[in-house]
Amino acid sequence: VYVLRSVGIPVATDFIISAPEAQGSHSWTVIKDGDGIIPFEYEDGKVTQGYDDKRLKGKIYRQCFGKQKKDITGIMDKPEVPAVLKSPYIKDVTGEYFGENSVEVEIDETECGQYAYLGVFSFPG
């Protein structure tokens, strides 16, 4: 990432916190161009354009150099919020991969706390 940035190529690291079928996180590199993003990974010392690791993906985040403009001050001391989501240096870029989407979830007010986290589940659960 830093080598590409040093020669003026706009590059970033995108990642998933949890893969639906693999129970683990994964990251890869993306180059931003005029048409969007080009995901790639180093394979045998070569950059593979059109990279697709075939992993199912839920939410995709980007590791950023600067603090993002989002208000997370209210969650910093909350143990129920996953630590990775407390970072001011990540942003949700799912829309760059799948387009914009939304979901409505009905929550029983008698059983909910202050936060809800939409996650992915994988076998065995």
Predicted segment positions?
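Hydrophobic/aromatic-rich core segments of domains that either
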Residues: V1-K78
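Acidic surface patches and DE-rich sequence motifs
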Residues: D33, T110, F123
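Surface-exposed loop/edge segments in extracytoplasmic proteins
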Residues: I38, P124-G125
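Beta-strand-rich domain onsets/edges
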Residues: I75-N101
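A short, amphipathic beta-strand motif
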Residues: N101-E109
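A short beta-turn/strand-edge loop motif at beta-sheet boundaries
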Residues: E109-Y115
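Short amphipathic beta-strand segments in non-cytosolic proteins
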Residues: A116-P124
